[in-house]
């Protein structure tokens, strides 16, 4: 049977093959080409005897990346039996410059295949599984521990690069509500809309669906973009990682976003404000077909929507070096009250690049987030407990009533080489899952990012 152990053996074989290939190219190539494990090379396997650089010049960029995350429940949580969990993801990618290869003006093709494996300390120790933790202390875990087609798209620019059109297989968070993923806590990593819109609505990495996106430059540093994405919950299933047909589709996700990329005092910033509308049916979180009867079905709504704001701005340099310094960030998402478990989400924090002169590439990050349960969803939980005569939290039949969850993380990123970053971190979770009965948790973690 093909299982996690089989995937692990296949992953090791992929790494071994790439390293062996890189070594062979290095031995046969020019002496000046970066060899395997060269700290200044783009990847661990080096420049393949100059072949990697030659391919890049011709428009071919092949990559193999790995992200691994360790989580240890140091204190608190639902289950206080101490242990550690490891989750990881391999990404095999290709980016082709179609202008260099075929002469297609300003055209790019991107392909990415991912494989996830491992376990999550959040599920195993921190959460009360009757009301799981909203965030995750190991963001790389999730969406199925399996192989997936994550990107397969083509984009092309027109009108002196003012207009860009993109079509193929990709997720909403790749272009809309986008945000970096340097933190290990999910509430501080990546597009947040996908975390709180609902598990079957907005698909973040590594899920892809058929989609199209049009982006236009309204003025220097000001862009507007719109998109249309297939809404197909069956794509979440583990055995549908490479599904290309439209069976199981339920509607469309239609996002729109205004993007501003100013320079303030010659320092870069990025600001996004946007909204999405879903044409798919969604269940109301409180209203019943038979009012007051919790055994009846929830009312079905014919749409769903939400809004977001993302802000990032570098505010200082370090000794006059603009590549180093302090940056601030914030994220806000708001969901419709009729169909959303999470009503709104707020996040803020800072990063500092090159804090120490001896380590100019290292980075430090501190972030906090609050996930707020929709009051209508909470009222439904209370009604269920009342109807079932449940008042004791320790009774397995009791439905924990969810409020606000708070997540915080402090990390230090050691840029050991150009292709290896190690980020030890400490995370604090107050009221995991918004459940006040669950002890506040401390998690020690390590995030590793490597390019081969």
Describe the predicted segments one by one:
Residues 62-70, 109-115, 165-169, 226-230, ...:
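Transmembrane beta-barrel strands of outer-membrane/channel proteins
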Residues 72-88, 102-151, 246-248, 434:
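Surface-exposed loop and membrane-interface regions of Gram-negative outer-membrane beta-barrel proteins
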Residues 46-62, 97-109, 159-162, 221, ...:
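Short loop/turn motifs that connect adjacent beta-strands in outer-membrane beta-barrel proteins
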Residues 2-4, 8, 12-69, 73, ...:
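N-terminal periplasmic/intermembrane-space "pro-region" immediately following the signal or transit peptide
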Residues 53, 68, 96-100, 155-158, ...:
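Residue-level signature of outer-membrane beta-barrel architecture
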Residues 440-452:
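Outer-membrane beta-barrel "beta-signal"
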Residues 122-153, 160-254, 385-397:
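Surface-exposed coil loops of outer-membrane beta-barrel proteins
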Residues 242, 257-259, 275-305, 316-319, ...:
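Outer membrane beta-barrel transmembrane domains
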């Amino acid at each position: 049977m093909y299982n996690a152990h089989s995937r692990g053996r296949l992953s090791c074989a992929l790494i071994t093959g790439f390293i062996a290939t890189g070594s062979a190219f290095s031995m046969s190539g020019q002496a000046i080409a970066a060899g395997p494990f060269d700290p200044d090379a783009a990847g661990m396997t080096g420049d393949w005897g100059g072949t990697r650089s030659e391919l890049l010049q011709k428009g071919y960029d092949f990559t193999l990346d790995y992200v691994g995350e360790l989580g240890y429940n140091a204190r608190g949580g639902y289950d206080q039996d101490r242990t550690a969990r490891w989750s990881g993801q391999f990404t095999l990618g290709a980016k082709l410059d179609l202008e260099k290869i075929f002469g297609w003006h300003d055209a790019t093709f991107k392909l990415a295949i991912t494989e996830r494996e491992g376990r999550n300390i959040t599920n195993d120790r921190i959460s009360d599984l009757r009301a799981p933790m909203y965030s995750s202390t190991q963001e790389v875990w999730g969406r199925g521990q399996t192989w997936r087609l994550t990107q397969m798209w083509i984009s092309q620019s027109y009108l002196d690069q003012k207009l860009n059109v993109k079509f193929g297989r990709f997720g909403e968070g790749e272009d809309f509500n986008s945000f970096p993923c340097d933190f290990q806590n999910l509430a501080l990593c990546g597009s947040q809309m996908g975390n709180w819109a609902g598990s079957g609505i907005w698909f973040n990495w590594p899920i892809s669906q058929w989609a199209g996106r049009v982006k236009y430059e309204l003025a220097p540093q000001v862009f507007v973009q719109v998109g249309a994405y297939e809404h197909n919950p069956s794509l979440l299933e583990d055995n549908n990682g490479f599904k290309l047909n439209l069976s199981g589709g339920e509607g469309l996700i239609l996002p729109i976003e205004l993007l501003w990329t100013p320079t303030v005092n010659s320092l870069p910033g990025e600001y996004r404000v946007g909204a999405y509308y879903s044409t798919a049916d969604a269940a109301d979180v409180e209203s019943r077909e038979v009012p007051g009867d919790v055994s009846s079905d929830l009312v079905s709504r014919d749409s769903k929507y939400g809004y977001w704001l993302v802000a990032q701005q570098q505010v200082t340099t370090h000794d006059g070096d603009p590549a180093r310094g302090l940056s601030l960030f914030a994220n806000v998402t708001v969901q419709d009250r009729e169909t959303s478990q999470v009503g709104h989400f707020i996040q803020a924090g800072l990063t500092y690049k090159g804090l120490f002169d001896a380590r100019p590439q290292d980075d430090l990050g501190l972030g906090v987030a609050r996930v707020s349960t929709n009051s209508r969803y909470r009222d439904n939980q209370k009604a269920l407990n009342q109807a079932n005569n449940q008042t004791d939290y320790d009774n397995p039949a009791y439905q924990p009533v969810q409020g606000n969850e708070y997540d915080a993380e402090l990390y230090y990123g050691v840029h050991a080489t150009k292709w290896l970053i190690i980020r030890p971190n400490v995370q604090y979770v107050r009221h995991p899952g918004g459940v006040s009965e669950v002890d506040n948790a401390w998690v020690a973690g390590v995030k590793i990012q490597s390019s081969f």
